[in-house]
């Protein structure tokens, strides 16, 4: 009697792990992208990184204080960069969305904006029951030429402003 129960419990645990690692659908990805970038933008525009910090994954929050975030992204604040308008734009993927062996969801993309393009790499883990950011890399620069090949996920456009921070770095 105990053996079948243990087998059923093991299957449920495996199924639960598999479900937790499912790639979110396109609508959820867009919400993750936009909410992360808008929290990031609000922090840069106001100079208050407390709310942005609170929305990050716990391991990220433990490693990076709001003050460290402010220092890391000071270029955006100094140049008064405001990317709030991206909420009205559709994100364009630059690479296939994937979850690595550590359970980190990676989303690479950009927004078709002029005169500069906003490119991002966002990394999320499951934290407190939701996908929360553990890495953010935002680059604002000239978009690639129309006849140029699509940008590689690892190579952002020539940046006027950029900032990157990631858990464990």
Please identify what each model-predicted range represents:
Residues 4-14:
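Sec-dependent N-terminal signal peptides
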Residues 15-20:
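Sec/Tat signal peptide C-region and signal peptidase I cleavage site
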Residues 24-39, 50-104:
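Short solvent-exposed beta->alpha transition segments
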Residues 91-169:
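Exposed beta-sheet edge and beta->alpha loop/turn motif
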